[in-house]
A protein has these predicted regions:
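Amide-forming acyltransferase catalytic core, primarily the GNAT-like/NAT-type
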Residues: 5-92, 163-259
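Conserved acetyl-CoA-binding loop-helix of GNAT-fold acetyltransferases
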Residues: 118-137, 162, 272-287
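Conserved GNAT acetyl-CoA-binding A-motif
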Residues: 139-149, 288-298
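Conserved small/polar residues in nucleotide/adenosyl-binding loops
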Residues: 321-323
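Conserved acetyl-CoA binding element of GNAT-fold acetyltransferases
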Residues: 101-121, 258-271
Length: 323
C-alpha cells in the first residue's frame, strides 16, 4: 500500500531536499501551460485554457457569496527539485457530474511520455496513484467517483483496482464522422423534433431515468439542472405530443481530445424501433457536417451496436466503467 499523499494548499509538498518527495502535486496555474508541452498533454490544451478562464468568474462569484456550480479540478505533478526547467510528470482532470458535487468523474489521467527517460524519475504508477488519491482528498464532499479505462490499458485497470474502484459496466466506444453530402433523414409523424431547453428539460430527465441502469442512476444522482449544464445547451429531443413524453434524445457531454464531441444518445426502452433514421437525425442536429461524434453503447445492446455499424461508425475498443 502506498503512503497517503499529504494535501496542502495550493500544492502537496514534502521536504524538497528529501529523496522521498521527488515530485509536487498542485492545482493547475497559468504558468504551468508552457511546461505542458509533452505529446501526452498537447490534446488537452484547449480544455486546460478554458478551465483557467472559467476559474476567474467562479472565484468572483464565490467571493460575493453567490452559489455556482463546481468547476473541474485539474492537478499537475511536477519535479520538486531541479536546477533546470521543471518537467510536468503527470496531469489529472476530474469533473463533478452534478451541481452538488456528490459524484465526480476522472475525466483524464495522463503521464508524460518523456518522464520515463529522466534520471531518477519516480515510477509512473506512483505518479498516477498519487494524483488520483490527491484528487479524492481534495474533494471530501464527494460520495462517489467514476472512472473509465480501456480494456487493453492494463496499467490503468491496475491503478483503479489498487485504489478501490470496482468494474460496473462494459461499453463499446464508437466514432462517427458526419458526411458532407448526406441529406437529413425525414422524421415520421407524429413525433416532434425539439431543441433541448429549460422548458422541456424535465422530459429529458424522465427519459434518462428510464434508460440509465438503476445502480448507475443512483450514483450519478443527476437532476434537471445537471443535465442542462452538462449539455451546454446542445441537445435535441424526439417528443411524443400525445403523451408529452421524450422518447429519444441526444446531447453533448464534452469535447473529445481526439477531435469532435462526446455525445449521449438515449432511446426509451419501449421505442427501440427508432434506431435508424430518427436517431440519425438527432445526431446530425448536434454537429455540423464533417464533424465527429463519439458515442458509447452497452456491449449487451446488440440492436444499437448493429445500427451504429450500419451507420458507418468505427469501433474504438471497449471501455470499462469503474465506481
Amino acid at each position: 500500500m502506498l503512503p497517503p499523499v499529504r494535501a496542502e494548499s495550493p500544492a502537496v509538498r514534502g521536504d524538497p531536499r528529501s529523496p522521498d518527495t521527488p515530485f509536487i502535486i498542485e492545482r493547475l496555474q497559468g504558468w504551468h501551460l508552457p511546461l505542458l508541452d509533452d505529446p501526452a498533454f498537447l490534446p488537452l490544451h484547449p480544455l486546460l485554457q478554458r478551465t483557467l478562464l472559467l476559474s476567474v468568474p467562479r472565484g468572483l462569484a464565490s467571493a460575493l457569496g453567490r452559489r455556482q456550480s463546481m468547476g473541474a479540478l485539474v492537478l499537475v505533478a511536477r519535479e520538486s527539485m531541479t536546477a533546470r526547467r521543471p518537467t510536468i510528470l503527470g496531469l489529472m482532470v476530474a469533473r463533478p457530474l452534478n451541481r452538488r458535487g456528490s459524484t465526480w468523474d476522472v475525466e483524464h489521467l495522463r503521464l508524460a511520455l518523456a518522464a520515463a527517460e529522466l534520471p531518477a524519475s519516480p515510477a509512473r504508477s506512483h505518479i498516477a496513484s498519487s494524483l488520483l488519491r490527491e484528487a479524492i482528498h481534495q474533494v471530501p464532499g464527494a460520495v462517489s467517483w467514476i472512472a473509465s479505462a480501456s480494456s487493453l490499458d492494463h496499467n490503468r485497470l491496475a491503478l483503479l483496482r489498487e485504489n478501490g474502484f470496482q468494474p460496473q459496466r462494459t461499453e463499446r466506444l464508437w466514432r462517427w464522422s458526419i458526411g458532407d453530402g448526406d441529406p437529413l433523414p425525414c422524421l415520421s409523424v407524429p413525433l416532434q423534433l425539439r431543441p433541448l431547453q429549460r422548458r422541456n428539460a424535465p422530459l429529458l430527465w424522465h427519459l434518462e431515468q428510464a434508460t440509465c441502469p438503476a445502480p448507475l442512476r443512483q450514483v450519478l444522482d443527476r437532476r434537471i439542472d445537471d443535465l442542462l449544464e452538462r449539455s451546454g445547451g446542445h441537445g435535441w429531443l424526439l417528443i411524443d405530443p400525445d403523451r408529452n413524453e421524450a422518447v429519444a434524445g441526444a446531447r453533448w457531454i464534452a469535447d473529445h481530445p481526439g477531435g469532435g464531441h462526446q455525445v449521449e444518445l438515449s432511446v426509451h426502452p419501449g421505442w427501440n424501433h427508432l434506431l435508424g433514421p430518427a436517431t440519425e437525425l438527432l445526431l446530425r442536429r448536434l454537429a455540423p457536417k464533417g464533424d465527429q461524434l463519439w458515442l458509447l453503447s452497452d456491449t449487451n445492446d446488440e440492436a444499437r451496436q448493429q445500427w451504429l455499424a450500419q451507420l458507418g461508425a468505427e469501433e474504438h475498443g471497449l471501455s470499462l466503467i469503474h465506481i
